[in-house]
């Protein structure tokens, strides 16, 4: 551990990583780099997987090291100052809620977090008999809560239209656009719209790359790149007409999987500054001390969560076993913990090309508990059925011993209802697991303890704080649950062979960001040129060895549309490049392999194969 830290911390953070050194994967933004800590993630057992992902999460709280590249971190003075400046502007909205609005917007995980945060802070205001003034926007609309709608994030015009619609009639709008990699066109369109109407809008960008690493390709069908938009926003900082909050939190444990660390850092950063704004509205000044106090509660959440590492590893192993046997993981949560479970389940589909039935989330009260704008969506089909009643009626009858059922609740929830549900599930499977949140002095009844073989018990200290402060414990429990689920599902799919080293190698290519990521992974694993990797990726998408001029001249949006209906696009391209074989031969090899990882591993070891960039680095 380095001994030059400015602030007192609750947890031990890792030493500075190789990723901070000049020249490390320098062509890639931090959010897309591979984390040196998890380089052999695919060879780890469940206990090691938990430890590695725990250490990656701890990087969120690292302070900057003056001896390395000067990345601003969460605890950097400049970041804390900007958080305070934004909190003061939130205060202005809170004082005039009738004419004002705080809008949180994002795509995918970021959009789901926007919903969670908007509802949390509206709930805080309602509890104080004040007017709610938070609103969320998700690319793809409310369908994106429970299904992956990633292609909609490529439309900047739609982003601007959605923003204009929700802000109609408002005179003062604080807009917070979340894009972990500083790349989402949907958010770029909204920021651009704000900067063209600065008399009403104050734009704030949240992400985890320096502006110099923002996506620089011009957005198809639009006038700018994301970087150009971010650079314009940067020029507004000194006049406080716009802000960028972009601390570096390090590469993801699973390369590029921003649902993990990026999502957690988003939650920590925004809840901290918004809570400080609410405290300050009660005549407490916005100070660095206030920000640091709240940030430390999230460090404490990390410590409490990973004190249960052994049990988290057991849950991961059980989940991997269920998935390996073509079973399922069903996550049943109470309150906002149910929404956190739904979020994790939905994100497995694009990240690991999972079937939507593999991991499913359910929430007590269904859409009524989620409080989404469009109301009950269950009529859209079984994928949209998310209440506990839906689970009992439509899913439980087919549950078997190969399935795992995970219940997530607090000891303030209806324990009689929970006990009845446990009894129903036990008739179908013995694989019942529980994540139970308690406050110090609360204990799980013996009747429940006896019926549940495996319990991850998390006990939180009593907080003697004012009303706003009581929300800290709710936020801690949500983050803790998120960390556990991220670790369990990412680890389970790693054990299933969906990860090679620490790279996602079987994700759905359903937007421009993922198309670029696929070509980047191909380059890093094979050492081939960008042009050659793009060519083979297109061969895999279209299933044609010889590409027509029409295909070559198609836009990235066209390629993404074609890729959406295909499976194993990236692994087929990887094996084809490594073996110099046809797309058809590559697909056949993958289909006959034990796992995608094993197909790539054996292709890496083909005699006479030219070593790629990642091979030489790993020696």
Curated annotation (Swiss-Prot):
GO terms for molecular function: carbohydrate binding; enzyme binding; fructose-6-phosphate binding; glucose sensor activity; kinase inhibitor activity. Keto-D-fructose 6-phosphate binds at residues 107-109, 179-183, 347, 513. It is found in: Nucleus; Cytoplasm; Mitochondrion. Residues 462-464 are annotated as: Essential for interaction with GCK. It holds the Pfam family GKRP_SIS_N. It comes from the Eukaryota. Its main location: nucleus. Keywords: Carbohydrate metabolism, Cytoplasm, Mitochondrion, Nucleus, Repeat. Belongs to the GCKR family. This is Glucokinase regulatory protein. The gene is gckr.
